[in-house]
């Protein structure tokens, strides 16, 4: 396969991983194969039950924060996606035992800049709005976890935020979700409100 086709095949897998785990650029770039973890509570995901992040955002003067991001059922399509990349695409780069998940055609680790470039190319190909950037995938991930009704603390931990207020800034829930929430709360406050009066 020509090198440009390998690059084109790698980019979608990498971009989808940003969304499926809500990672920052640096976190994704720093991933090694050893960072893919099993989750004993979700054995069906095999080695993709969780991702161990070693290069999380640090506070001033502190080392990078580490955390584990669990694969959630709503995003479990990433399991087959990563399996395909690791078994079919990555070996074609001839990287041997290089530890990085995301590798270049010259057997090095991909850069943050290359992630931006791949996202820009995908955005233009899909005719998406110009103002979108790669970090928007992280915002979408956090919003979707909220809409999937995960607890706030779980979402905060998945995102690697030190404060719940930071996570709240990332969340932009849909009107449909807000309507469902009001419907649920009204049902709790006024039992039988949604029953058909006969």
PLM features: residue spans?
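Basic, Lys/Arg- and aromatic-enriched nucleic-acid-binding interface segment
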Residues: 1-25
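A short, glycine-centered helix-capping/turn motif at helix boundaries
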Residues: 17-31, 148-150, 161
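C-terminal secondary-structure termini that scaffold catalytic or DNA-interacting sites
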Residues: 185-198
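Catalytic-site neighborhood detector that most strongly recognizes the C-terminal catalytic loop/helix
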Residues: 159-185
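C-terminal catalytic core of Y-nucleophile DNA break-rejoin enzymes
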Residues: 59-83, 97-120
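Short, leucine-enriched amphipathic alpha-helices that occur as contiguous helical runs
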Residues: 7-12, 112, 116, 138-139
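Conserved tyrosine-mediated DNA breakage-rejoining catalytic core shared by Y-recombinases
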Residues: 30-81
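Short, basic (Lys/Arg/His-rich) helix/loop patches that form interaction surfaces
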Residues: 108, 116-157, 161-164
